[in-house]
């Protein structure tokens, strides 16, 4: 029996990955992390979608200790999300160590349930400057977890080399375009669906959707080319 653990936030990317995993695996376990993010609605959206999509199990883990260490606009209500980069060249929405912690816990969960695949929606193409969304980081984490648990673990990143328009094409290919567009929460200001239109996350999401809807055949063809190359 093929089992997978999907790191699931209820946003566009992780929901697309979850829908894809449900078509490929016999058992899909979703894991959502409560790290004190600004909007608890994110967790509620993840719970609703996991139930609606019919995952095998959905675990919500309290990792609020991250908020005690990591000062970020995503975890602190008194820090507005900014389009400007900080002195270190990173946006103020970067939560240091977040994906290190998330992938470690997802790997432990996979070990416990006998899964050898962890799926995450990180992407290097439109990664907002986050170093823990890069392929070299994921590869390093994959090696560390596999060695540390003596498990043939594979961290899969289906969106790693897709741009946002191609991610929308993938959702459409999976028959989930409307669900991803109207029921997911990507917005840093906590608005479901098309969002606020002003924060960096909404900017990426909306630009990608417009590009896809304006050039459906072209973008879908580009997606299929990347899928063929990956296999």
From Swiss-Prot:
Its UniProt entry gives the catalysed reaction(s) as: 7-carboxy-7-deazaguanine + NH4(+) + ATP = 7-cyano-7-deazaguanine + ADP + phosphate + H2O + H(+)
Q: Which SUPFAM superfamilies match?
A: Adenine nucleotide alpha hydrolases-like
Q: Which cofactor does it need?
A: Zn(2+)
Instruction: Report keywords, A-Z.
Output: ATP-binding, Ligase, Metal-binding, Nucleotide-binding, Queuosine biosynthesis, Zinc
Q: What is its EC number?
A: 6.3.4.20
The answer to whether keyword Nucleotide-binding applies is yes
Keyword NAD recorded: no
PANTHER family reported for this sequence = 7-CYANO-7-DEAZAGUANINE SYNTHASE
The family database entries (NCBIfam families) matched by this protein are listed as:
7-cyano-7-deazaguanine synthase QueC, PRK11106.1
The protein in question is named: 7-cyano-7-deazaguanine synthase
Question: Which lineage is the organism of this entry classified under, starting from the top rank?
Answer: Bacteria, Pseudomonadati, Pseudomonadota, Gammaproteobacteria, Vibrionales
Provide the gene name from the record: queC
